[in-house]
């Protein structure tokens, strides 16, 4: 008997949600998921490298790899290993110096429409070499934040795709508007308004 009432209550909730927009939505994005996004979008080259200057075939080059993210207070810190051969290319050999510093940039998460973005890039640690910093600064302050953008609405739509099989109802996200983003422990917590339809 209890199962019948539970099913009826679930059906009524689904019916009401299908008729009116369901407003409050909270989405949690883990640090690992964000790190995976950065690696897939920026470090998708051979061996997970992103060439800032030159290529794998160049005598002299600068590339970044091994991106690690951590959450510190209300900011995200990206720690990236850099490898560089700086100098002059002579007959296919780089005459100069080799460097392998670790760089860090701190970013503030924010919401814009359906997207989780990152801004206010602050360099925490870069190389001691001015010629390398000339290449690293734009990479850390522009390319890293733009490659970490997450379409929150798309994430939710993918998560809801299997709803018909699991519940018998087709649940779809029609609209999402992000209001705030906060860091809680190892998660990025996104508060948003969303219109969800149940059919």
Could you tell me what each predicted segment is?
Residues 9-18:
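Bacterial N-terminal signal peptides
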């Amino acid at each position: 008997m209890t199962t019948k009432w539970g099913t009826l209550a679930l059906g009524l909730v689904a019916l009401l949600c299908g008729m009116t927009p369901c407003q409050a939505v909270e989405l949690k994005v883990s640090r690992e998921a964000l790190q995976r996004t950065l690696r897939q979008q920026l470090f998708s080259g051979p061996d997970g490298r992103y060439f800032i200057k030159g290529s794998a075939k160049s005598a002299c080059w600068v590339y970044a790899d091994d991106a690690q993210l951590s959450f510190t207070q209300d900011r995200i810190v990206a720690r990236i290993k850099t490898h560089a051969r700086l100098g002059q290319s002579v007959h296919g050999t780089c005459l100069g110096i080799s460097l392998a510093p670790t760089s860090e940039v701190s970013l503030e998460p924010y919401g814009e429409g359906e997207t989780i973005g990152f801004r206010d890039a602050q360099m925490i640690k870069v190389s001691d070499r001015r010629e390398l910093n000339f290449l690293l600064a734009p990479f850390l302050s522009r390319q890293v934040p733009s490659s970490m953008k997450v379409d929150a609405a798309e994430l939710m739509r993918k998560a809801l795709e299997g709803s018909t099989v699991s519940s018998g109802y087709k649940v779809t996200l029609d609209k999402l508007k992000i209001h705030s983003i906060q860091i809680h422990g190892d998660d990025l917590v996104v508060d948003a308004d969303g219109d969800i339809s149940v059919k």
